[in-house]
């Protein structure tokens, strides 16, 4: 006789994709763990269905109740996020809003606490389902968090093929005047209101006794109102034109406006820009009126080095970046049999001539001149080199 107990049949229920994404978040995982301990069951998401299996023998689990709890918490979480965004939008000065793929959004969520701590921004709100990442704080803090997020994504996924939107102002910048309870508005005195609109007894409307001054004197009433009006009541005459109010700028004008672009190039190609005493870099800087900084101190795990381009406008930054990338592409297209030693002395370089780095005495020679060759060193250096003594001496 077989005494084996039958395996409990799982209960399945369809759930939407957004609710499924909520259950994958830390808050949703904690809620699922709490429900499993409370109902003594196992909750699993298979494709688009919520599967619940009872852990206790002979105890049925109501999957509808579990689904209702999950849905209520999920909806309350969305409402809390909306309230949180509205409060941050009114309390912070700047915001950075971007849409990322889900894999990118997961990396940002993993490092969100570190990004917020190092950039000192007010808050970072991340929605994994839509890939929406929103950063709030001051202008400096949000810009710092944006740069750190770009560097973090570049470290994990390589060069980004998407543009992260720049920092924008929030609605708080529109509210320049705050409420001051010490400043009172100028209202007509109560005596004037009582004289114009006599109410009589408090319960006059409930009693048959009419108020003391029930007869309205229209000329007197219009004269009283005329004194407290800004413009006369004669509408045939248009009101006088007032001088337009000069709106003060919200922020002081910037005295130094610069644009900055960061581009990653292969580490093996850094010598093309910095070779020959950085002649190519200086040429690009003079041509496009910009400053190029190659951050060789940055240790990258995927073999790329950041190049920072600072100019007065975006057009100059874009042109300088295109020049750098065309230089990299021109050297990558060359055959490997004749590799150049620097980016400036190459005949095929788009910025130089054929005889730019050769000395006058070497130009007539057909042999290619190498600056680092041992035979091209002065003979004085060879004479001053100490001789090596043989072991027999």
Swiss-Prot record:
It is found in: Cytoplasm, Perinuclear region. Residues 79-157 are annotated as: KH 2-like. InterPro entries: KH_dom, KH_dom_type_1, KH_dom_type_1_sf. Gene3D superfamilies: K Homology domain, type 1 (3.30.1370.10). Disruption phenotype: RNAi-mediated knockdown results in increased apoptosis and increased sensitivity to DNA damage-induced apoptosis in response to ionizing radiation in the germline. Coiled coil: none annotated. The keyword Zinc does not apply. GO terms for molecular function: mRNA 3'-UTR binding; mRNA binding. Residues 12-76 are annotated as: KH 1-like. GO terms for biological process: mRNA splicing, via spliceosome; negative regulation of apoptotic process; negative regulation of gene expression, epigenetic; regulation of alternative mRNA splicing, via spliceosome. The KH-like 3 domain is required for binding to RNA. RNA-binding protein which binds to its own mRNA and target mRNAs to negatively regulate gene expression to modulate apoptosis and differentiation in the germline. Negatively regulates the expression of the argonaute protein wago-4, and may thus play a role in RNA-mediated gene silencing (RNAi) in the germline. This is Messenger RNA-binding inhibitor of apoptosis 1. It comes from Caenorhabditis elegans. The gene is mina-1.
């Amino acid at each position: 006789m077989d005494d084996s107990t039958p395996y409990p049949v799982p209960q399945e229920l369809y759930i939407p994709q957004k609710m499924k994404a909520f259950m994958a978040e830390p808050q949703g995982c904690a809620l699922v763990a709490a429900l499993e301990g409370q109902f003594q069951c196992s909750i699993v998401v298979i494709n688009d269905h919520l599967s619940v299996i009872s852990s206790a023998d002979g105890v049925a689990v109501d999957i509808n109740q579990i689904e209702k709890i999950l849905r209520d918490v999920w909806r309350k979480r969305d409402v809390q996020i909306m309230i949180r965004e509205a409060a941050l939008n009114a309390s912070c000065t700047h915001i950075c809003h971007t849409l990322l793929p889900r894999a990118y959004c997961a990396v940002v969520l993993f490092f969100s606490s570190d990004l917020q701590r190092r950039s000192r921004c007010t808050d970072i709100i991340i929605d994994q389902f839509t890939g929406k990442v929103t950063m709030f704080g001051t202008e400096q803090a949000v810009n710092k968090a944006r740069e750190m997020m770009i560097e973090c994504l570049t470290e994990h996924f390589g060069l980004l093929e998407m543009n992260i939107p720049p920092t924008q102002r929030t609605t708080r910048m529109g509210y320049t005047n705050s409420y001051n309870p010490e400043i009172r508005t100028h209202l007509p005195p109560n005596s004037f209101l009582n004289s114009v609109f006599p109410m009589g007894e408090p319960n006059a409307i409930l009693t048959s006794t009419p108020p003391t001054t029930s007869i309205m004197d229209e000329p007197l009433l219009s004269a009283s109102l005329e004194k407290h009006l800004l413009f006369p009541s004669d509408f045939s005459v248009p009101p006088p034109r007032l001088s337009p109010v000069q709106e003060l700028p919200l922020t002081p004008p910037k005295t130094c406006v610069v644009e900055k672009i960061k581009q990653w190039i292969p580490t093996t190609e850094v010598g093309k820009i910095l070779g020959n005493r950085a002649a190519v870099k200086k040429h690009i800087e003079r041509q496009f009126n910009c400053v190029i900084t190659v951050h060789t101190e940055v240790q990258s795990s995927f073999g790329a080095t950041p190049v920072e381009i600072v100019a007065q406008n975006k057009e100059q930054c874009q042109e300088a970046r295109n020049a750098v990338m065309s230089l990299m592409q021109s050297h990558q297209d060359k055959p490997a049999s004749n590799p150049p030693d620097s980016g400036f002395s190459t005949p095929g370089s788009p910025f130089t001539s054929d005889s730019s780095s050769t000395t006058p005495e070497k130009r007539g020679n057909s042999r290619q001149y190498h600056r680092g060759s041992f035979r091209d060193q002065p003979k004085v250096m060879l004479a001053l080199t100490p001789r090596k003594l043989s072991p027999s001496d």
